[in-house]
Amino acid sequence: MMDFGIYEKALPQSRDIEKVFQTAAEAGYRRFEMALDKDRLERFRWSKKEKAEWLRASLNSGVQIYNLVLSAHREFPFGSHKADVRKKAYEIMEEAVEFAAEMGIRTIQVAGYYALDSEEVTEDSEKRFIEAMHHAAGLAGRAGVMLGIENMDRDIISLDQMKKIVEEVNSPWLKMYPDVGNLSAHHFNVKQSLAENIHHIVGIRLKDTKEGVYRRVPFGEGIVDFKLVFSTLFNSGYRGYFGVEMWNDNSENSVEIIKEARKWLLQQTPQ
């Protein structure tokens, strides 16, 4: 049976991290995706005791902290027109790689944003992003942590765009982390996109979407053809990681929701 990872924001919020990991385990998940957005940057300055609490919870529950979802670059993109924003983007990446290495996290999911939402994306924006990926790949290689660029709701939206970056950087430490929901919402040929780039993929983001709606679409109610996604990946030889992206939004039945999501996704896999 497949082991799915679950996004931290899908779980009920609690100061008791042992409870968080135990909840993930009881819901059937064996891997965990840590959220690192602009409001969680203080995690980079955790004490050894704080890091140990998370690692102990992971070991006790049997749920591995596998992926770091580095969404902070939405507010601090590498290709921004503003020098101070770009400087912060580099600082975040350097801290993320060091943090992931210390926590034993295998992959860092890199948000494919060239610029701030309020800025125009130019050729210089793209060039600056690629320069940053050269730098990031060097950091990742020295730390032994994989980087995977995620296709987003804007800027980097296709696997062709990611392929251009990955091939230009040409590092074994920088690959792709396709979000099949975003691919579908942008009306790309999901089967072709995945099959043609299978050797560059280090993780798959499982999320349902609708046209123009990139978040909070319950599994099975959107436009993503998950049976096609799984069959394409398996037939192409993919045996890697799958992360389930959801948001609990303080729902009283969030645990039941993530249980049912896992059950539903398993039903979409080749029998």
Residue ranges of each PLM-predicted region?
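Conserved beta-strand positions in the central sheet of alpha/beta enzyme cores
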Residues: 33, 67, 109, 148, ...
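Glycine-rich, proline-tolerant flexible connector loops at the mouths of alpha/beta enzymes
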Residues: 35-58, 112-118, 214
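Histidine-acidic metal/acid-base catalytic patches
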Residues: 1-5, 10-30, 156-178, 182-271
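Active-site acidic/histidine proton-transfer and metal-coordination neighborhood
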Residues: 18-19, 55-64, 76-175, 185-187
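Short, conserved active-site loops that position catalytic residues or coordinate cofactors/metal ions
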Residues: 27-38, 67-74, 111-112
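Conserved beta-strand edge residues that scaffold enzyme active sites
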Residues: 38, 72, 114-115, 154-155, ...
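Transmembrane beta-strand segments of Gram-negative outer membrane beta-barrel proteins
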Residues: 1-4, 60-66
